[in-house]
Amino acid sequence: MRAVGRPDIGGEPMPPVFRAFDDNQIIFRRAEVSMIAGQPGAGKSTLALALALRMQAPTLYLSADTNAHTMAMRLYSMITGNSQSESEKIISENPEQAKQALAQARHIYWSFDSNPGLGDIDDEVTAIEELLGESPALIIVDNLMDVAMDGGEEFGGMRSAMKELKYLARDTNAAVLVLHHTKESYSADPCPPRSAVQGMVNQLPALILTVGQHQEMMAVAPVKNRYGKADPSGNTPVWLRFNPEYMYLADLEEAR
């Protein structure tokens, strides 16, 4: 992967985004791997995109699961408050207007390789280092099952990928955020338990959040938290206001 060129540093918290997270010691930290896990459609990517946009820190977003057009549409909605259908129309018919709004996310650097290997991820990080003169502060992998690993069975490959991503976090002092699936056979009411995370990859992340969607709310449960409160059952989540049509995600007291 990457040669370790400096002593391990890190652990600094990333900029806060949601008060509900701060109040419950849900903190994303540099030089650590964190994970957001949930069933398909639960809002994992929406939460990750909101974090990337609002932290305003140099970010590498590896969007293996979603194409560039869809991510632009989602991001435009999140920035402007338009619905995704309205955003798609504006991006198509008035690209200059769209570019002006999307400039608020100029700190996010994108890769849309649908099956990146660890070497590809390393190359993307190196390209940002050459451009900015420093490593990205946040690296988002969306999602773990799309990371290509040579040989071996699928779950073993995911565990190997997690080990390499931990090395990457330490080497770059970046907060690495991995999106992953939970088993659909487990209840997601309000959130899946830690045992539902696929592939037995629970050991390495410092923070694991599972998510569930409930009407106009997103439940976010810290099922593992090295630096704060956790409940492996997923039964004690924090709540955010959530409207996926508008890519709207906010603390309850800020709901519009």
Report each predicted region and the residues it spans.
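Replication-associated primase and helicase/ATPase modules
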Residues: 1-16, 25, 104-108, 130, ...
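The Walker A/P-loop phosphate-binding site
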Residues: 1-82
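Phosphate-binding/switch region of NTP-binding enzymes
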Residues: 22-24, 41, 160-256
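Flexible loop/turn segments at secondary-structure boundaries
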Residues: 43-44, 67-71, 146-149, 184-187, ...
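Short, well-ordered alpha-helix to beta-strand connector turns
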Residues: 31, 56, 105-106, 204-206
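Hydrophobic/aromatic beta-strand patches that form the interior of the parallel beta-sheet core
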Residues: 34-36, 60-62, 109-111, 177, ...
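Conserved inter-motif catalytic segment of the P-loop NTP-binding fold
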Residues: 59-153, 239-242, 253-256
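Helix C-cap/helix->beta junction micro-motif
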Residues: 55, 135, 171-172
